[in-house]
């Protein structure tokens, strides 16, 4: 986080207490990895006992329990920030973190959140790039592997493999999926001996 600074634990307005919508989304995504946090922000109602009396606690997130896939996270309000809402939604194999800041009313806060979530659901799709990359790599091997010369080595005894993607599944705009292109850049000459895991090229998407 580079544009976030916390001065107090309560979050009331202060010149030195600030963040951005993007970094609030990053922080929320990290916080959801904590099972206790995830359980609390995903709970619609809870009853506690105070001095022998029952006290009902109601989550102020209007979307929780009223929109498919919503599982958190937090409403907020100060005079400086106005109405805020960070929402977590899981649908269509996507985990969406939506941040709305500075809304004039609760209604606008909720409606803007719904619009943003629906925009993502209608325009993006999770694509497994690893499968596409593997297919492209196999095609490249069949066409070009034998053109790579390793001087002083046994001809055609070169074995190559593809490093797995760290994040193989990513959201991509639906109208861009069919236009994805791949380009393989590689060296075609080496001197033996070659170390295991020598990089001979790269595949760009």
Where are these regions (language model features)?
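Short, charged, amphipathic alpha-helices and their helix-cap/turn boundaries
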Residues: 1-2
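Short, conserved loop-to-beta-strand elements that form functional interface hotspots
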Residues: 9
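Domain-terminus/edge residues, biased toward the C-terminal soluble/receptor-binding domains
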Residues: 13-205
